[in-house]
Each structure stands twice: as structure tokens, then as C-alpha cells.
Amino acid sequence: MNGRTLFFRRLFDYYKYQFKVLHAVIDWTVALYIVLPAIAFVIYQYIDLMNGRGLLYEWSEVAEWRWLYAVCVLIMFTGSIRTFLMEADKVFLLQKKEIIYQLKRYALLYSFLATLAKWLLLFFIVLPLISHSVLITFAESTALLCYLFGLHIFFLSLKQDRIRKPRSISRWIGDTLVRAILFAGSAILIVFTERHLLALFGILFLFFSVIRSLKKTASFTAFEAEVTEEKKSRLALAGLVMMMSQEAGMPKVKDRMRRKPLLYRNSKRIFKRRTICTGYKELFFKVMLRNGEYARQMYMLLSAFTVLIFVSPIWLKVIALLVYTGVCRYILTLIFDKVMDAPFLIGTDKESDEYYRARKSCINILHYAFAACCFLAAAVSLLFT
């Protein structure tokens, strides 16, 4: 067995597992009454948009090119450098290191091709829609595609560093500043730079990122972190499905490195008054602060609706705000119930007044906070309309 055979075997197993997850959720009734009508609706709206009519055409005329840049920014946050490593591979590192190295190189090539496929799909779907309104030529759009693809690969190479190194507040702030500078600089380059220079920047980003990624691939010092990240990538779709289910749950893929919480260390109390109600509330808030998955879910939901609000016309902003307030409260309810379903809380009385009072209070506090952020984004977006 060589690295190429091992790669294709694990790639097939990966997609087979994802297909089983989708098959478990989408049976023939769901496909017949929900999925197929949704696909037909999207195709119908796309044809109307191509012909210059329909609801989406009016929305795109108001939003102009801002919605496209928002979509590009969201794509930048997706993807990762795959390795297809497993915990059992550590046994072969001493004797068959070359096979693991070949596996990681093929996985790196697959990650680049998957990223390129995303941008090509967006390119061929969006180009016919904006060519008549933005007045962009095929050569200019190709240069833009080259730049965005190179920038995305550069972000993926930076994500490799975050996986290998322990997380900290200073590192998170630095990474956020780098992303903000690159996004702002990209907007300036896209608007004011000629297509040849824009394509050159994209090629430089791609060349630099490939060299960095190849060096990281040849190293085995972060084997445990890469295995953990691979588990998260494999379970991402299943976790998205299970997040909406109260009866089912996904096992959390934990990092082996022990980290101290940033807030309320050493079990420091949040509430001075100790009652059954405050005990439930303190448990829930500490889990929300220390469990990155729950915080990430709420952050992704808020980010998606914030972008939608910024690029939408006024009437669609109102609809987005109403939808977000309902979805946010529903997800917070699911999270609270999952937290309280922990094994050490089996003997607690979940039918008591204190439990329901704490449940309502916790959900209301976070719901009002997230809704306020969304309303603030809507107010700021009105300044640019």
C-alpha cells in the first residue's frame, strides 16, 4: 500500500459517511416535498434573475455589488487543509513515515482543488448575473477569481498555524487584525487596481501559501492536533444535523491540551446569592463561556444574519430581523436543554418552578443580547443605504 491508495480509500470512506448522514436525514418524503421543490424554486428564481425580472432582481439592483463581496467574505471563512489522518496512523510513523507523508501531500492537493471548485462554481453562477449591471469583462472577472482563490489559500495556510499552536487571547486578536487588514486591503485592490496587478497578487498569495503548506505537511510535530481537526471536519455535517435535534447529540471532539477558562477561574461564583435558580443559571452561563462549540454556533448565526442585513434592502432587513429573533431563541432553547441533560444532573427536578424560572431567565438574557447586536447592525446598515 502506498500513500495514494490510502488517500483515495479514506476519501471514499469520508464521502460515504457524509452520504449516510444525508440519507438518514433526507428520506424520500423529505426529498419529494421539500428538497425538490426548493431546487425548482432556486432554478426558477435564477432564470428570472437572468432575464432581469423577479424578486431577487429587484433586491440585487438595490444591493448592487455589495452582496457579492459579502458572499466572498463568507467563503473565506470556510474550508481547511485536510490531512485524512487517524489516531491509528501514529503506529506507522516510526516504520512507514513516507506513506503518511504521501497521504498528507495528496490531502493537501485535494484541499486546494476543493477550494478552487468553490470559486469556479461561484464564478460561473454569478458572472452572467453581474456582467450586465457591474460592467465587468471576462478578463477582469478572471483576475478577480485568481486573486480571491490565492487569498483563500493563504487564509487556509494561516489556519494551519492556529491548529498547531495553543490558542490565546493575544493570538486571537492578532489573527483578527490580520484578517481585517487583508479584507480591507482586498476591497481597495479590487476597486482601484488593474486586473494584471490583481492577478499577480493572487499568484503571489498562492505561491507563498503552497510553500508554507508543504513545509507544514512535511512536519509530524502536530500530529495530535491534526487528528483532532480531522475529526471535527468529518463530523461537521453530522454536528449541524444533530444541533437541531433535542433527542440526539454528537460526541464533542476535545483537544488534549488542557486550558484554563478566561473568565471565572477556579470555580469563582457569578451570583453571590446561592439559590436553586441561580445555581442553574450559573451552570448554564459557565458552560456557554467555556464551551467553544456553543459560542461558535451563535457567532456563525449572528454573522450570517448580520451580513444579510447589511447587503439587503430595507424591507428585507425587517424580515431578516424577525427571522433571526425567532431562530436565535429556538437555538438558545436547544442549547439550554442540552446543557441540562448532562449526566450529573440526572437527579435534578426539571419540573420545578426554579428550573423553569432559570430556563426563561437564561434564554431571555442571551436572546436580548444577540437580538440587540442584530438590531445594531441593522441601524448601522441604514447609514450606508
Swiss-Prot record:
Q: Which UniProt keywords apply?
A: Cell membrane, Membrane, Transmembrane, Transmembrane helix
Please give the chief subcellular localization of this protein: membrane
Q: Which Pfam families match?
A: EcsB
Membrane-protein topology:
Multi-pass membrane protein
> Can you list the GO cellular component terms from the UniProt entry?
plasma membrane
Kindly list the residue ranges recorded as spanning the membrane: 24-44, 67-87, 106-128, 133-155, 176-193, 197-214, 304-324, 365-385
Q: Which InterPro entries match?
A: EcsB_ABC (IPR010288)
The entry's localization annotation reads: Cell membrane
User: Domain of life of the organism in this record?
Assistant: Bacteria
According to the UniProt entry, the coiled-coil residues are: none
Name of the protein this chain belongs to: Putative transporter YthQ
Q: Which organism is it from?
A: Bacillus subtilis (strain 168)
Q: What gene makes this protein?
A: ythQ
